[in-house]
C-alpha cells in the first residue's frame, strides 16, 4: 500500500508540474496576445477638448436648409431642390450629442481631478441648449433619467415645464462655474472653435471663458422669452430670473455687441457657406426670397432688402426702387413660383453677397441683435423695468451693422441685367439715414403697448433671417408675428404644424413612457398640429 501511495504521489507531482507549466504557457501567451492586440494607433481615451470640438460642430443649424424655409425667409422654386412644405413626421433629437457631452464630462474629471473645469462648465450650458431645443420641437422629453445607457434604457419623460426648469438651473450652474474659473484665471480650455480657436479674432482661453459666460446668460434670457405664454406660472419665476440677470451685470454678464455672438464662421478651404461660388450655376435661380421676409423689408424702406436680394427686374421698376424687391408667398405652388422667378418677378438671393465667394456671412446661434429685442420684449411685457425703446433701437442698429448699412452713402451691388458670366455686376450708391428710418410710423416705437410689442417682434423676426435655426418659426408659433403665408405650397392642408412627432423608434424602444407622454400632452395622438404646454393653449 505504501508503495502504491508513493507512486500516486509521484504521479500527482508530475501532473501538478505539468499543469503549472501549461498555466504558465497560457499566461505567457495571453500576455503576448494582449500586447499584440493593443493597437498603438488607437487612443485608449479621447481628450476632453476633442470631444468638446465634436459637440460644438454639431450645434449650428446651417442656412439654406429646411429651417429657413419653415421660418419663411427663403423658398425653393424648383422641384429638384425640394419644396416649401412643412414637415409631416418626426423630429431628429440630439441624444447622441448629449452622450458625447457626458463622455466629455467624465474624461475632464479623470484628467483634471476636479469637478470644476471648463469642460464641465460648458457641458452644463450645452445640455441646457440641446434639451431646450429638443423640447421646443416635441414637448415632454426624457431628461432627468436620460443619458444613463444600459443602466436605464427606458427613461421616463419629464414634462416640458420640468425640462425648462432643469435647463434654467443648468444655466445658473454654468454661469457660477464659469465665474469661478475666470476668477481663478483658468487657462486650460482647448477645443473651443467659437472663441478660443475662432478663425478671425481668436481669444485666449481665459477670454474665451468670459465670452462663454455672456453667451450662457444671454441664452438664458431667450429661454425665458420662450415661456411668455406661461409666464404667470409661479414655479417658472420668469420675471424674477429675468430681473436677476439685468440687475446684476457683474454676476450675469451678457453680450455687448456683435463680436460677442456665438456664431459659426466659414472659410474657403473647408466649412464653406452653403450658397457659394461653386454652386452658383446650380441653385442661384432656383432659390428665391420669401415674401414674409423681403416684403417686410421693402415695406419699411429697409436697405437690408438690397443687401440680401436681387431686384425683380420683370416688374419694371428701377433697380434701387424698393418696389423691385418682392418675395414669393411660401404657400405658392412650385410651378407658379418657378415661372414668376424665371420672368424676373421675384427677388433671388443677392449674387454678390451669397455667391461671389465662400464665406458670405456668419451664422448666429446666440446673437446680440436678438438679445436686444428679447430685453425690449421683456420690458414691454412688464417683466422688468427699463427703457424698451433703447434696447429696441440697439437691436436694429446692430442689425444694420451686421449687413454693413451705414448712415450716408451705401454701395449696393447686383448682377448686371443680361450678365454674360459670374462676377458681371452693377453697383449703385444709395443714401441711408437711420434717423429717418427710425422715424417711420411703422418703426418708431409706440411705447409699451401691443403695437410696440409687434414692432419689437417684427424687427426680431428680421434679425433671425438665415440664422438661429427655427427661432423665426418659434416666434411665429408663440406670438403670431409676423403673419405666415400658407397655401398648397406649404402642405398640411394649408395649416402650419405646431410641433414635430416623436422619433418613431420611441414606440419600440420606450413604448410605455412614450405612450404616457403622448396621452398626457396630446390625448394619445402624436399629432403635428397639437399645441404643446408652453404655448399656453
Segment roles from a protein language model:
Residues 1-38:
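Bacterial Sec-dependent N-terminal signal peptides
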Residues 25-34, 70-77, 135-145, 265, ...:
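Short, compositionally biased low-complexity segments
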Residues 29-80, 85-86, 92-95, 103, ...:
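Membrane-proximal, proline-rich intrinsically disordered regions
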Residues 72-126, 130-408, 446-451, 459:
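Structured, solvent-exposed acidic/aromatic patches
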Amino acid at each position: 500500500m505504501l508503495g502504491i501511495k508513493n507512486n500516486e504521489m509521484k504521479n500527482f507531482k508530475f501532473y501538478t508540474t505539468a499543469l503549472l507549466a501549461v498555466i504558465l504557457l497560457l499566461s505567457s501567451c495571453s500576455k503576448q496576445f494582449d500586447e499584440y492586440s493593443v493597437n498603438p494607433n488607437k487612443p485608449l481615451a479621447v481628450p476632453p477638448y476633442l470631444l468638446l470640438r465634436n459637440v460644438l460642430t454639431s450645434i449650428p443649424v446651417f442656412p439654406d436648409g429646411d429651417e429657413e424655409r419653415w421660418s419663411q425667409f427663403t423658398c425653393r422654386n424648383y422641384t429638384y431642390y425640394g419644396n416649401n412644405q412643412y414637415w409631416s413626421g418626426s423630429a431628429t433629437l440630439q441624444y447622441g450629442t448629449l452622450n458625447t457631452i457626458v463622455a466629455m464630462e467624465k474624461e475632464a474629471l479623470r484628467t483634471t481631478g476636479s469637478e470644476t473645469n471648463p469642460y464641465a462648465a460648458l457641458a452644463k450650458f450645452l445640455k441646457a441648449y440641446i434639451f431646450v431645443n429638443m423640447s421646443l420641437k416635441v414637448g415632454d422629453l426624457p431628461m432627468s433619467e436620460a443619458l444613463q445607457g444600459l443602466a436605464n434604457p427606458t427613461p421616463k419623460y419629464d414634462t416640458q415645464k420640468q425640462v425648462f426648469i432643469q435647463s434654467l438651473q443648468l444655466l445658473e450652474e454654468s454661469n457660477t462655474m464659469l465665474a469661478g474659473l475666470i476668477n481663478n484665471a483658468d487657462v486650460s480650455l482647448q477645443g473651443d472653435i467659437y472663441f478660443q480657436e475662432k478663425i478671425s479674432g481668436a481669444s485666449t482661453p481665459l477670454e474665451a471663458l468670459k465670452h462663454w459666460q455672456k453667451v450662457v446668460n444671454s441664452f438664458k434670457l431667450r429661454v425665458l422669452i420662450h415661456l411668455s405664454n406661461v409666464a404667470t406660472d409661479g414655479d417658472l419665476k420668469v420675471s424674477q430670473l429675468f430681473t436677476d440677470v439685468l440687475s446684476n451685470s457683474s454676476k450675469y454678464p451678457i453680450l455687448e455687441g456683435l463680436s460677442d455672438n456665438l456664431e459659426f464662421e466659414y472659410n474657403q478651404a473647408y466649412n464653406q457657406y452653403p450658397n457659394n461660388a461653386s454652386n452658383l450655376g446650380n441653385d442661384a435661380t432656383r432659390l428665391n426670397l420669401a415674401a414674409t421676409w423681403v416684403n417686410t423689408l421693402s415695406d419699411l424702406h429697409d436697405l437690408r432688402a438690397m443687401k440680401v436680394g436681387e431686384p425683380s427686374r420683370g416688374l419694371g421698376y428701377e433697380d434701387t426702387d424698393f418696389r423691385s424687391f418682392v418675395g414669393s408667398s411660401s404657400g405658392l405652388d412650385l410651378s407658379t413660383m418657378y415661372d414668376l422667378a424665371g420672368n424676373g418677378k421675384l427677388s433671388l438671393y443677392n449674387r454678390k453677397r451669397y455667391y461671389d465667394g465662400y464665406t458670405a456671412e456668419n451664422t448666429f446661434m446666440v446673437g446680440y441683435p436678438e438679445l436686444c429685442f428679447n430685453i425690449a420684449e421683456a420690458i414691454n411685457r412688464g417683466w422688468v423695468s427699463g427703457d424698451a425703446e433703447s434696447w429696441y433701437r440697439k437691436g436694429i442698429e446692430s442689425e444694420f451693422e451686421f449687413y454693413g448699412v451705414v448712415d450716408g452713402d451705401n454701395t449696393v451691388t447686383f448682377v448686371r441685367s443680361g450678365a454674360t458670366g459670374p462676377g458681371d455686376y452693377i453697383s449703385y450708391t444709395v443714401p441711408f439715414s437711420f434717423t429717418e428710418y427710425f422715424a417711420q410710423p411703422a418703426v418708431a416705437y409706440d411705447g409699451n403697448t401691443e403695437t410696440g410689442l409687434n414692432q419689437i417682434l417684427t424687427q426680431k423676426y428680421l434679425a433671425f433671417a438665415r440664422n438661429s435655426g427655427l427661432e423665426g418659426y418659434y416666434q411665429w408659433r408663440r406670438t403670431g408675428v409676423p403673419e405666415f403665408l400658407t397655401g398648397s405650397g406649404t402642405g398640411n392642408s394649408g395649416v402650419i404644424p405646431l410641433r414635430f412627432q416623436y422619433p418613431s423608434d420611441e414606440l419600440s424602444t420606450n413604448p410605455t413612457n412614450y405612450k404616457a407622454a403622448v396621452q398626457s400632452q396630446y390625448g394619445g395622438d402624436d399629432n403635428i398640429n397639437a399645441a404643446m404646454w408652453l404655448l399656453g393653449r
